[in-house]
UniProtKB/Swiss-Prot annotation:
Annotated protein name in UniProt: Transcriptional regulator AacuB
Listed Pfam families: Fungal_trans, Zn_clus
Compartments it resides in: Nucleus
A single GO cellular-component term on record: nucleus
Keyword Nucleotidyltransferase: no
Organism of derivation: Aspergillus aculeatus (strain ATCC 16872 / CBS 172.66 / WB 5094)
Lineage: Eukaryota, Fungi, Dikarya, Ascomycota, Pezizomycotina
Main location: nucleus
Length: 734
């Protein structure tokens, strides 16, 4: 009975016996494309009375990594025997820290990307075979269990010989290419793309769905101005040439490029207002978006996106998902993003061990795409269900390099050296490095997946580490930014706001680990972080420099900052920070919600009650004090909310009755607008608010009061947020 063959190499002394050389089909059988019995001379040549010429083996395309590793281990063992210090390729197993040393498991090899924050303690390395076990293909062939390792083969396992006939003989090795080819042929011809986009309605002529040449280049320019600087998932020098060629021959565009072009149309329109769309293209934004999104779906079907292993097809899917975000329920979009992430994992862009054959350009574009995709997914999960986020220490894709697109050429074998000054990658790099820190942090994992804390980087003092991270980012990138440059301005204030959000989350994590009520000093620390979040967001929303980037700013509504401030103001209405807090909220409210549309009504109803309760606490305290001074002047935000509530109260009765009949709102009456409410901030439905612009999901913010189970209580009524069918109400209002 055959025994399983392991692909792992855990020791330096065990070497597998050499496999017998494969006998290739003879030259004549290859030319005639018939089966050769691989004897010499073969039966076919004997029967044809011709000379049988044995084919020569093609040169191996891949370097024999296994032989190199074996020799390297031998040299390392010799150095160890002679007590010569050196840096080993892999840390010996004996040097590993046990789980009992620090209470957590070690991080797999390479599982931490190389970011700015180099002061973090990097855990020891486990054996290579354990980490790469997930990359093995388990196949039961001829009674033998074959463990095929993607990154450790004999240099020829991944490819067939060019002239092989494809038949498997007794002397053949079972290679990954053979297994994969057989598996692919099993499902050949089965198109399952309808599972994602539905069955096509008749024949769709995609060439007729493209805009005119002038509009193609206008959309491309909008993409370069508004979208590309923030996402950086396409390589402008090479893609622009292809788009110019494609525009000159619309009917002969490859399916992958066509899908990418339509996704660029879609995401470009996302960054424009309706007035800009009418001025540039003579049509309404909604009309254009609907048409291009439908065409993009058909183009993605044409390139078999669900089976594709092409990075550019995945980029097209990602841009399409970004474009539909404002009008899509976050829970639904999260499900679609899981498909995109699974495709990315099948390609292997999350795993550095799969990059061996990639050029420098392809490697960098994969890094950029993975980080952009994961950060987008994390934000969507904040709005729906944090526990499904993929921002975790379970993969090892490196942070993108701080290099310009023109520094990356297709023929380059090695990547260029990163710049020490801001480049066009500034926003994407800084955002990725901050996300790289967060994904290893306990304050993030405690809310998303606490079990992953066992493999996260151990930080002795996360508060101090956050300060060090901010200092590192400031010194390496932000100190050289020009605030008059739009991208630099966007990077400065986005990162400062994101750091404040991380500090607030870390503050909650600390307070939730103790049953002792927070002190006033601790409360004031949280207030400072929340104020910083609001002030940074207001800077982004009011500056004319960010006009083209406003589509992404809308995506990050600072709802946790509002809730934190209002919670505190309700309990401490006359603290020293009260006036500053009301002013900061009023400034942000003026640019965020002063002109709220009908679509925002569900969110506004809830938000208005939280605000009015906090201000009523201030007024009640003034009355109770019986001061002779004039009553406090309501902030601008309170005045506007009261006006809107009065307008809504006059017309809300009929709308509420209709909603109750349809099951949209449970137990909501017109009078509820004037009654205090109790909010369950752990309800995921709340994250849908802000009219599609994206309120932050509140599950990780459930300990806003940090004082126990009643932390989410902002009122005294029986009305719970999770009794409202937000999606049904939103659909009715639209």
């Amino acid at each position: 009975m055959d025994t399983p063959i392991s692909a792992s190499n855990q020791t330096a002394t065990v070497v597998k016996p050499q496999q017998p050389r494969r006998v290739l089909a003879c030259v004549l059988c290859q030319q005639r494309k018939i089966k050769c019995d691989r004897t010499f001379p073969c039966t076919n040549c004997v029967r044809a009375h011709v000379q049988c010429e044995q084919a020569t083996r093609q040169r191996r395309r891949r370097f024999p990594e296994k032989e190199l590793l074996t020799r390297l281990r031998l040299y390392e063992s010799l150095l160890q025997q002679h007590n010569i210090k050196f840096d080993p390729l892999h840390t010996p197993t004996a040097d590993h820290r046990s789980a009992s040393d620090d209470g957590r498991d070690d991080l797999p090899e390479g599982a931490e990307s190389e970011g700015t924050f180099g002061e973090r303690e990097k855990p020891a390395v486990k054996t290579k075979s354990l980490y790469e076990f997930g990359s093995c293909i388990n196949s039961l062939i001829s009674g033998r269990l074959i463990l095929v390792n993607r990154g450790d083969d004999d240099g020829n396992n991944g490819e067939d010989d060019e002239h092989d006939t494809g038949f498997l003989h007794d002397t053949d090795d079972v290679r990954p290419a053979v297994i994969q080819k057989a598996w692919n042929h099993t499902f050949q011809g089965q198109n399952n793309d309808h599972l994602l986009f539905g069955s096509p309605v008749g024949t769709v002529n995609l060439s007729a769905s493209h805009p005119s040449h002038v509009h193609i280049f206008r959309l491309w320019q909008v993409y370069l101005d508004n979208v590309n600087p923030l996402l950086k998932v396409t390589h402008t020098p090479t893609l622009q040439t292809r788009i110019i060629d494609a525009a000159s021959d619309i009917t002969n565009i490859s399916p992958t490029l066509e899908a990418l072009m339509f996704s660029i149309y879609c995401v470009s329109l996302l960054s424009l207002s309706d007035e800009q769309c009418r001025a540039l293209f003579g049509s309404a934004k909604k009309e254009l978006s609907t048409g291009y999104q439908f065409a993009c779906q058909q183009a993605l079907r044409s390139c078999s996106i669900l089976r594709s292993s092409d990075r550019e097809s995945l980029t097209a899917l990602y841009l399409y998902l970004v474009s539909i975000r404002p009008d899509t329920d976050p829970a639904s979009l999260s499900s679609l993003l899981s498909v995109a992430i699974r495709i990315a994992q099948r390609i292997g862009i999350h795993n550095e061990s799969t990059y061996g054959k990639c050029s420098a350009l392809e490697t960098e574009m994969r890094h950029r795409l993975w980080w952009s995709l994961i950060i987008f997914d994390n934000r969507i999960c904040e709005m729906s269900d944090d526990k499904t986020a993929s921002l975790a220490p379970t993969w090892d894709c490196k942070v993108p390099l701080n290099v310009n697109d023109f520094e990356l050429q297709p023929e380059m074998k090695t990547p260029p050296a990163p710049n020490n000054r801001p480049t066009e990658m500034l926003f994407a790099v800084v955002r990725s490095e901050l996300a790289d820190f967060v994904r290893h942090s306990a304050f993030h994992l405690n809310f998303t997946n606490p079990s992953l804390n066992t493999i996260a980087t151990r930080l002795t003092d996360e508060t101090a580490q956050l300060v060090s991270l901010e200092r590192a980012l400031e010194e390496k990138y932000l100190a050289f930014c020009n605030p008059e440059n739009a991208l630099h301005f966007m990077t400065l204030w986005t990162m400062r706001g994101s750091l404040a959000k991380s500090r607030l989350l870390q503050h909650y994590s600390q307070c939730s680990n103790t049953s002792v009520p927070p002190t006033d000093a601790q409360r004031n620390t949280g207030i400072a972080h929340a104020l910083r979040m609001l002030e940074c967001d207001t800077e982004l929303m009011t500056s004319p420099l960010t006009q083209g980037y406003r589509w992404l700013v809308h995506f990050h509504f600072p709802f946790p900052a509002y809730i934190h401030l209002l919670q505190d103001l309700k309990k401490r209405p006359v603290e020293a920070h009260a006036d500053r807090a009301w002013e900061a909220m009023s400034d942000n409210y003026a640019v965020r919600m002063m002109d709220a549309s009908q679509d925002d009504r569900p969110f506004f109803i809830v938000f208005s009650r939280i605000v009015l309760q906090a201000w009523e606490a201030r007024e009640k305290m003034a009355v109770a004090a019986q001061l002779e001074t004039p009553p406090p002047v309501p902030p601008r935000m309170v005045v506007d909310i009261r006006d809107k509530v009065m307008q809504m109260t006059a017309s809300f009765g009929m709308d509420a009755a209709a909603a109750v009949e349809s099951g949209g709102v449970v137990g909501v009456k017109a009078g509820d607008l004037d009654m205090p409410m109790q909010m369950d901030f752990a309800a995921p439905e709340m994250a849908y608010g802000a009219g599609g612009h994206g309120a932050t999901g509140l599950e990780p913010w459930g300990c806003l009061d940090m004082a126990g189970p009643a932390a989410g209580d902002v009122g005294a009524n029986q009305f719970l947020l999770n009794t409202m069918e937000w999606n049904a109400l939103h659909a009715r209002d639209r």
